[in-house]
Amino acid sequence: GEFIRGLMQTWPGQRVLLLTHVKELIAQNYDKLMTLWPDAPAGIYSAGLNRRDTDHDIIFAGIQSVHKRATEIGHIDLIIIDECHLVPKSGMGMYLRFLKTMNVINSKIRVVGLTATPYRLNSGSLIDGDDRIFTDIAYDVDVMQLVNDGYLSPLVPKAMDNEFDLSEINTRAGDYKTDQLHALTDNDALARMVLVEILAYGRQRKSWLIFCTGVNHAEKMAQIIAEHGITTATITGATPPDVRDTILELFKSGHIQCLTNCDVLTTGFDAPAIDMLVFLRPTQSQGLYVQMCGRGMRLAESKNDCLVLDFGGNTQRHGPINALKPQGEQKAKGSKATPPSRTCPVCKTIMAASCTKCPDCGHRF
């Protein structure tokens, strides 16, 4: 929001289009700009939000709504793509098709991407490749700097006693095979053992977000958690939009304490009060891992940190959020698949191997 306001005030007469992929992000980005700059000449183009503004100097749009309507949008000077790691590396997807047409309308158009994960699964950096959209990283900031400066909430990842055994799970297209993960987690005994740890750690936590391997898994976990008096709901890709909106509002307002989901609340979902993440979804995708972590790093009143219960071994696999190495770079340099980390023998907090003192309990190594 501040970037757009500064741009428009420094160079009046520019037209800016901010693109993203879900209506929740469109609304969040628009609302934040209007809070920062109430007189902003901003509109929204999104079928999901029932708005199709085209005459404003600043337009917040969904790619699904505009990818075939470039001529309606007209001349744009700057396109900002939020969550730009979702732009495909090659081919004519919605983003690439739209950008190609917009470039015909204005050959001097510029494109800026915003993301917490400037790389894709198994394809390295967003600025690599002959057909890349982005040529340079203009600004990069370390996660720990943002935490130390008070812009993000710290994560406290914990190793679990009932961490999933993935030794028999195969890989397809760079990640664990979905059907095998479903079979692994479709186990009542395992679910009950996991539940014991979730309840023990969650007693002092107010807002839980749980990532599951599939729809059945998400619904099962919600059911057994609710049996213990925890207000719980589930969101999946099949949840009707009006039901989804109601559930999210109840979760954000604290009327629902626990929300389980399957691959729908990983990118751009903004619920600052979340103070416990539960990873029941193992992944080899570092991008997905970082996005899941990001759901707990928003600041909120009376929130000191966000606990991460990692049953999928993701933190050990990819490294703590402040000690990551992109998978593409790891392979290119021949480095180990798992960045170095260590686990506190006292409180089970996972941290960078370079740490000499546990950031949670103070144990010295």
Model-based region annotation:
Residues 2-3, 7-35, 215:
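Conserved Walker A/P-loop ATP-binding site and its immediately adjacent core
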Residues 58-83, 88-98, 261-262:
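Conserved RecA-like ASCE ATPase "motif II neighborhood" in helicase/translocase motors
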Residues 27, 43-54, 219-223, 230-262, ...:
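Conserved helicase ATPase core of P-loop NTP-dependent helicases/translocases
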Residues 34-71:
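Inter-Walker segment of RecA-like/P-loop motor cores
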Residues 139, 143-153, 300-353, 364-365:
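A conserved SF2-helicase RecA2
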Residues 64-70, 85, 237-325:
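Conserved RecA-like P-loop NTPase helicase motor core
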Residues 88-157:
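Post-DEXD/H (motif II) to motif III coupling segment of the RecA-like Helicase ATP-binding lobe
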Residues 135-212:
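Conserved interdomain linker/interface between the two RecA-like ATPase lobes of SF2 helicase motors
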